[in-house]
């Protein structure tokens, strides 16, 4: 069917723009578009979970979301608009894609005197270490940070429950730092005593969220998402690597070895 035909790889040049939807406890979407003569010629859509993990639609179990990610790019291109027919059962994904696409298109039409950031809620994550990584949902209005929600993901890929978390400084940092970011209107805050590592992760996550909110920004060399590859096979087996990118930065690498 025409709606699901494959598209050739996107040329990453200044005719390419990226936009992000608002984030919620169910994640967010990203849209990457290429324009030629003011027309959309290529659209790539991605969704990320509330843990800032790209959804792998090759194994994703909810069929309407899989269909939406596959079909909607061509619908947007054909209509040359965000106003297209949605996918039954995937309304939330559809709305996120449309908002991300609208913001990408608005970034292509920047003008003097505009604000620095889109209004909305944007999600960023930090680099991972042996103890996990931080996540920030940053709400922006009129170029001001008006709200911040912080999360931490542990080394098992699960959200930390700060109601029962035993390290008191980390609990206090999680509770107090959102207001510090609001008052600073930036990720540049003092470290929280006894929770330096957590503070650093939150600061990086807030910075990455703000970068997603930018109306005008340069195209990164590395596109957000998770990329997987395997080595050649020899008599002892092979290796695999999974690399996660956020805001032009490698934030996580997972390695595996497989026997022959």
Regions found by a protein language model. Name each.
Residues 3, 7-14, 18-117, 124-222, ...:
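Active-site- and interface-proximal helix/loop "cap" or "latch" segments in soluble metabolic
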């Amino acid at each position: 069917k025409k709606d699901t035909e494959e598209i050739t790889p996107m040329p990453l040049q200044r005719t390419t723009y990226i936009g992000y939807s608002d984030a919620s406890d169910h994640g967010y979407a990203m849209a990457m578009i290429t324009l030629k003569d003011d027309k959309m010629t290529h659209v790539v859509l991605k969704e990320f979970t509330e843990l800032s993990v790209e959804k792998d639609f090759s194994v994703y179990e909810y069929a309407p979301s899989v269909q939406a990610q596959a079909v909607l790019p061509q619908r947007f291109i054909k209509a040359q608009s965000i106003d297209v027919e949605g996918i039954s059962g995937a309304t939330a994904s559809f709305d996120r894609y449309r908002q991300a696409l609208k913001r990408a298109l608005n970034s292509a039409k920047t003008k003097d005197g505009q604000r620095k950031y889109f209004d909305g809620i944007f999600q960023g994550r930090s680099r991972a270490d042996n103890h996990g990584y931080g996540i920030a949902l940053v709400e922006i209005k009129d170029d001001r940070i008006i709200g911040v929600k912080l999360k931490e993901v542990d080394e098992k890929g699960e959200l930390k429950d700060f109601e029962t978390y035993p390290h008191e400084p980390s609990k206090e940092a999680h509770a107090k730092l959102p207001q510090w970011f609001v008052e600073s209107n930036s990720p540049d805050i003092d470290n929280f005593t006894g929770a330096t590592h957590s503070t650093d992760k939150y600061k990086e996550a807030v910075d990455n969220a703000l970068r997603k909110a930018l109306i005008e920004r340069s195209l990164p060399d590395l596109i957000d998402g998770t990329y997987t590859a395997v080595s050649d096979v020899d008599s002892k087996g092979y290796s695999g690597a999974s690399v996660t990118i956020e805001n032009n930065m490698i934030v996580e690498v997972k390695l595996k070895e497989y026997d022959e």
